[in-house]
């Protein structure tokens, strides 16, 4: 049985893969996506994985913190201040 969190994350992955415009075979796999589906079968490479992680962080408001409770480089809080996607930030 699929729980709500799993379902939401699968939805995030589907949205990302579909927005990247996968081929016809990928579209068939995306339609049957489960927690057991390997991301490589969807054509997700390391950069695509980083995008999926970014999407999940944004959806759930995840923030990396250091031992002093400050936002660390790469955290959503830090990215909000830079105003750009982490791949585009300098």
Curated annotation (Swiss-Prot):
Residues 4-89 form the Carrier domain. The modification O-(pantetheine 4'-phosphoryl)serine is found at residue 46. It comes from the Bacteria. Keywords: Nodulation, Phosphopantetheine, Phosphoprotein, Plasmid. The keyword Oxidoreductase does not apply. Residues 65-90 are annotated as: Disordered. InterPro entries: ACP-like_sf, PP-bd_ACP, Ppantetheine_attach_site. Residues 78-90 have a biased composition (Basic residues). 4'-phosphopantetheine is transferred from CoA to a specific serine of apo-NodF. Proposed to synthesize nod factor fatty acyl chain. Involved in trans-2,trans-4,trans-6,cis-11-octadecatetraenoic acid biosynthesis. This is Nodulation protein F. It comes from Rhizobium meliloti.
């Amino acid at each position: 049985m699929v729980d709500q969190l799993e379902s939401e994350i699968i939805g995030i992955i589907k949205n990302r893969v579909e927005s990247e415009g996968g081929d016809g075979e990928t579209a068939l796999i995306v339609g049957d996506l489960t927690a057991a589906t390997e991301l490589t079968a969807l054509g997700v490479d390391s950069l695509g994985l980083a995008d999926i992680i970014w999407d999940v962080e944004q959806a759930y408001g995840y923030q990396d913190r250091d031992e002093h409770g400050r936002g660390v480089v790469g955290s959503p809080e830090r990215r909000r201040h830079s105003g750009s996607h982490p791949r585009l930030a300098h």
